[in-house]
Amino acid sequence: MNNISPIDGRYKENVSELEGYFSEQALMRYRILVEVEYLLSLVELKSFQKKRSLSKKTLSSLRNLYIEFSDKDFKQIKKIESKTNHDVNAVVVFISEKLEKISRKDLIPLVHFGLTSEDINNTAYSLMTKGATKNIMVPAIKNVLKELKKLARRTKSLPMLSLTHGQPATTTTLGKELAVFISRIERELVLINEINLLAKFSGATGSYAAHKAAFPKANWSVFAKKFIKRLGLEQSPITSQIEPGDSIAELLHSYVRINNIFSDFSLDMWLYISRNIFVQKNVSGEVGSSTMPHKINPIFFENAEGNLDVANNNFSFLASRITKSRLQRDLSGSTVFRNLGVGFAHSLLSYKNLIKGVLRVSPNKKQLKKELDENWSVLAEAIQTILRKSGDVHAYDKIKKLTRGKPITKKLYLQIVNDLKASKEDKDMLLQLTPHTYLGEIDKILENL
């Protein structure tokens, strides 16, 4: 009721699955995950094994700190933070207190050993982003594609007047135009799957200085690489205090492209509905306008378009900002990173609205036929191309004089063809051609749809 952001208010139910990745509580949980797994990896090193060993019970207790992380745990950390005024330090204190409760005070010195807060934060953010992408965002995008493919398959053989520059152009099919967006999104999904998110775990200024001072014989760079790999990330080998953020920026740019494609799709669907190419379902009880009772507005495509714009503004800003920091580090990037989930939420909301929009439309075959019947001029391209094939160097200009800016009816088209100086074979082909059949190799193009 009193939320400032519509994501946490009006749209909360639509994006709640992202809370496990981008809420502050989720961030705390991922920080604990990184701290705990780092502690467990340290204990495996020979330098530490002589002094400490872990039972299965201890292992389970430690991992349960993030597996079973609760509202109560989160509130406890926030209470600690209210005193320390440092969120990562509050996590360290929380873990230390838990170790004391299970009688493993000997492990407390290893919590956050040799690390800076950024080691924990950058790794946590990469894990959050990777998890949200794999488990929420990509499946949501695929769900849009699933419904869009169904619609494209149903309409792939429905001839439609295409418009270039808003003017009648070569015949296409409704399904083929939808398939354009499917093809573009499928390509982006391949690319997004190839992006490896990076993390650094090399201390205050990226040199393992504290680690090396404590245990000079250990190969800390190799240790960090193995640890980061174990978490499912790639090592960023040469850094300052911060991980530069280039890999997350790369991922966000992928989302920008995906969202631009979906925005383009939303705009086209809006225009097709406006042209009466698609008609929308009349859902009983719904209201389209507060003053015009007759209206059924394309609200789902409009909502998607608006939220895609919000998402992309967020993604573009983040992708630019998170890759910059003063010298070895400043804190301005920290508050920026806290907004990482905003673009994901607005994107997810858009994807769900696109599905709703697609499910509510059906093709208007009468309108499709009407537009083609009224635009025989689109066959002018075929006529001039046939004449060119026959060697007529003035073919284009001849047909231009006969058709440009003129209403071409079926009768006039047939007259133009009959008056051509062309072979009987070519004339017969053109006489059989109609705006409904001028489809080129669309069947072949769509055979794998």
Model regions and ranges:
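Glycine-rich anion/phosphate-binding loop at the beta-strand->alpha-helix junction
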Residues: E188, E234, S240-R326
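Hydrophobic stripe of amphipathic alpha-helices that form coiled-coil interfaces
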Residues: L151, T155-L158, I192-I195, A199, ...
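A helix-coil-helix interface module used to build multimeric assemblies
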Residues: M1-Y208, F215-A224, G288, I299-F301, ...
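A structural signal for small-residue-enriched, beta-sheet-centric alpha/beta enzyme cores
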Residues: S117, K212-F215, R230, Q235-I242, ...
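Conserved catalytic cysteine-centered active-site region
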Residues: K98-R104, A224, I228-G245
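Generic, well-ordered alpha-helical scaffold segments in large soluble proteins
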Residues: E37-L42, F94, K98, A132, ...
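Short amphipathic alpha-helical segments with heptad-repeat character
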Residues: K130-V138, K142-L145, K149, A179-I182, ...
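Glycine-rich cofactor/substrate-binding loops
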Residues: M1-Y30, V34, K57, I80-N85, ...
